[in-house]
Structures are given as C-alpha cells and as structure tokens.
C-alpha cells in the first residue's frame, strides 16, 4: 500500500524559489578587500535569485548550454558565485567549481575529465586560467565576472565574455524545468588525495537533504536572522552546503572573497556581526593570535565550525 502524502522532487529549484519569495530581503555581503573598488558589496536573496535566472537564460541562449553540460567556476566566495551555482544547477546543467589552489595540471585534468564547456572566472585569475586552458579542449567559453574583460589572451577557439554584459537585458524570470531529484546538480573534485583528483556527483535530492540537516541544532544550526560567515570555499564541498540551508531559513551570509587573512577577517567580523562561521583550522588559529595582539571591542561570533584537518590544541 502506498501513502497518500504529497510526493514532490527535492530540488535546488524549490530552495531557490522559496528563499527568494519568503526570505528575499535577507542580506548577502561580499567583502572585496583584495579587489579594487568598494570593500563591502551588499545584495539579497531575491536579487541573487533573479540574476541566477538571467544567467540561466545566458547559458541557454548565448553559451549553448541546453542539457546537463558541466559549467565550471574559477573564483572565490562571492555573490556571483551563488548566482552561477543556482542558475546552472536549477537549469539542469551541472555546477563544477574548480579549486585554484591545485596545481595547473590537476585543474586541467578536472576540466578534461568533467568535459567542462563553460567557465565563469574572476578576472584576477585570468593569467592562471589561460595557462590551465592550454590543452583543455572541451572549454569553448570563459565568462569573467565584472563589467569588463581582462587583457589576457585565452587559447584559440575560446570565446570570452563579460558577466555583467552577458546578463544585461536578460529576463530575470526563468521557467525552471521539473527535474528528477536524482539528477546531478554539482560535480566536485577531491583535493589532497593520492593520484589525480576524483569527482563526486551530488544530486539535487542530496543537496536538499543536506540543507535541511544543516538547520538542525545537532549540526551547524543555520538559523533565521543569524549571520553566517562562510570561510569554506564553494569549491570545497559547496561551502559545506551552507548556502542551501541559508536559503531555506533566511540566514544572512557573509562571503570573504579572496582575502581571509587575520586582519581582514577581524575587520569583516567587526563590520558584519556574524554569529556563526566555518573554515579550516589554520584560519581560526591565525585569527586567535591576531585577537591576542588586537583584542576586539566587541565579539558577536559565538560558534566556529572547523574541518578539513584536525584542530590542534591552542
């Protein structure tokens, strides 16, 4: 006998739509201390969701992504990274973040193994990406975040676009397909393992359930109204799935971009008042030493989750 309860696919599309409708004004702050221009860039869930839809249109209409092609990213934690994540996965393509800290030949291996066709990259990484793409034959387009394209040549046959120009004028409404919840949403590759990096395909269902689990008090307790500082990069297990839990609950996010040095993090924490954060132990040990020399006037951070390596005794 089957139940009479509702049965709907657990997909990132439902998370995206719910977060933008119910928690649309929840803030996302990107801290651009290592980039020219304003340090603090503010947006919200509704705007990110709308721009994710515009990016999905660009993928289909201009970049030729019509199925489950892999779309890579080569960037740090920022609002645009979330737009690309949601826009890619909800469209039915496979989001594939690349770890810039790997050796170039390892990154090239990932691109070739995943057969990535489009890469969205930070222009500060243009020179490294140009070297990586030599011998990465599957890539046919690179999109650089920002309004302009960096003066760096990409290999022959690779079209180069500006992210803002690509999104300009696009509809911010997308008729997301109804995906089987077992459909792959993201493809992440291992680091620090023997041999070549190894890929793991995450289903929409798995990421949906992860987001629900992260809301639990027995887990990271991602909670409505409590700001979460995301120092785990999106290219490391999708920042542990925290963005999905945040979209479910309405938890504001702080994204530190490229600079997670102690002085910068101390400034970010003082300015944005996060209650919870996650990151590798090295970051927090360095921040602890910084605070010993420069005690903060006030401290809102009450919980830190560390992973990736054992936490040494302080």
Predicted feature locations:
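A short helix-loop-beta submotif of the ANL/AMP-binding
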Residues: 69-70, 76-96, 100-104, 112-118, ...
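A short N-terminal helical cap/helix-turn-helix that marks the beginning
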Residues: 7-31, 50
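Structural core segment of the AMP-binding/adenylate-forming
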Residues: 14, 90-165, 273, 280
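Conserved AMP-binding/adenylation subdomain of ANL enzymes
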Residues: 208-227, 235-275, 290-292
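Conserved AMP-binding/adenylate-forming core of the ANL superfamily
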Residues: 28-86, 103-108, 162-165
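Adenylate-forming
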Residues: 76, 121-131, 147-149, 232, ...
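Conserved pre-ATP/AMP-binding loop-to-beta segment of ANL
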Residues: 24-27, 155-161, 168-189, 196, ...
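Conserved AMP-binding A3 loop
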Residues: 41-47, 185-212
């Amino acid at each position: 006998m089957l139940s009479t309860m509702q049965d709907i696919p657990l997909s990132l599309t439902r998370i995206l739509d719910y977060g933008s409708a119910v928690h649309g004004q929840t803030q996302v702050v990107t801290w651009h201390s290592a980039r020219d221009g304003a340090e603090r860039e503010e947006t919200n869930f509704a705007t990110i969701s709308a721009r994710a839809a515009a990016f999905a249109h660009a993928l289909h209409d201009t970049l030729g992504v019509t199925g489950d092609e892999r779309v890579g990213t080569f960037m740090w934690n920022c609002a645009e990274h979330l737009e690309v994540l949601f826009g890619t996965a909800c469209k039915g393509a496979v989001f594939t973040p690349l770890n810039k800290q790997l050796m170039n030949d390892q990154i090239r291996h990932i691109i070739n193994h995943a057969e990535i066709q489009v890469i969205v990259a930070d222009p500060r990484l243009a020179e490294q990406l140009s070297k990586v793409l030599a011998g990465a034959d599957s890539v046919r387009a690179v999109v650089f975040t920002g309004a302009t394209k960096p003066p760096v040549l990409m290999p022959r046959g690779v079209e180069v676009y500006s992210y803002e120009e690509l999104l300009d004028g696009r509809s911010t409404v997308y008729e997301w397909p109804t995906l089987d919840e077992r459909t792959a949403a993201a493809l992440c590759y291992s680091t620090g393992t023997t041999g070549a990096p190894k890929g793991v395909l995450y289903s929409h269902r798995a990421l949906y359930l992860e987001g629900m689990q992260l809301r639990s008090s027995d887990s990271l307790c991602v909670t409505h109204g409590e700001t979460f500082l995301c120092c785990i990069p999106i290219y490391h297990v999708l920042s542990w799935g925290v963005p999905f839990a945040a979209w479910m609950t309405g938890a504001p996010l702080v994204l530190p971009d490229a600079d997670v040095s102690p002085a910068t993090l101390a400034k970010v924490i003082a300015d944005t008042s996060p209650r919870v954060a996650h990151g590798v132990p090295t970051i927090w040990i360095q921040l602890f030493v910084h605070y010993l020399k420069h005690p903060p006037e006030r401290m809102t951070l009450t919980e830190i989750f560390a992973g990736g390596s054992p936490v040494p005794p302080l």
